[in-house]
Amino acid sequence: MNGTMRYRPLGKTGITVSEIGMGLWAAGGDAWGKTEDQEVLRAIDYALDHGVTFFDTADVYGNGHSEELLGKAMAGRRDKFIVATKIGWRNFDGEKGQSAYTTVEAFIAGVESNLKRLNTDYIDVMQSHIDFRDPTMEVFLEGFQRLKQAGKIRAYGVSTSNFEYLKAFNHDGKTNTLQIDYSILNRTSEKDILPYCQKQGLGVIIRGAIAMGILAGKFTADTRFGEGDFRRRWHENPEEYQVFLKDL
């Protein structure tokens, strides 16, 4: 492990991770502007060289392309990576307001697709990407437990900022992790969610630590984002944009 990176246990999972992880939403190439595959692979190599072991992706990032790139990067060195991915939004039925996985069998088949794209036989942390009380929550939970028993996932959790949903998801105390948006601009989880996670032994995975780039010191009121970057909405919707600008 890198001498300057720090590592810590991920809650009660028994998994040790680098304190800084690499999120791979942008690697999908369909939400943060155009990305080049070789650039993504070089970035992953750079992260590894600097002690990063934790990599987070999802089936919906680039419609699976982000997972495929991570799988390519892991070839021949799977043991260097702690892989977290997600399931739920891919093929989501907006009219019914539920995921495509209405049976445990369908859900397990969905995770098998994650495994195939990642080119691995196990996932370290498998997460529900659904962040509200989806009718199929119980399907996800049973599926996660079966997959864990089969050795195809080491731990499971949920990505949500909804405290009531988190408690429902963890009603049996078997959930391992929570992924949540948290930064110096968004500290609302300090009131209820983070104390709950500490009490329950949940590993907390922070997303949005630099607030989608706002805290990187690169943006001004005149910044405009390119085609394919969802942040274009910030200046297309002045009211939303002002919410961000006031915190710069």
Task: Describe the residue ranges of each PLM region.
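Short, acidic/polar
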Residues: 34-47, 102-118, 160-168
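Active-site groove signature of glycoside hydrolases
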Residues: 115-134
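Conserved, mostly hydrophobic/aromatic
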Residues: 10, 22, 40, 47, ...
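A short, structured active-site edge motif that brings together acidic residues
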Residues: 80-92
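N-terminal binding-site loop/beta-alpha segment at the start of enzyme catalytic domains
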Residues: 1-81
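Active-site mouth loops of central-metabolism enzymes
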Residues: 25-38, 93-108, 133
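Beta/alpha (TIM)-barrel catalytic core signal, keyed to glycine-rich beta->alpha loops juxtaposed to Asp/Glu
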Residues: 131-248
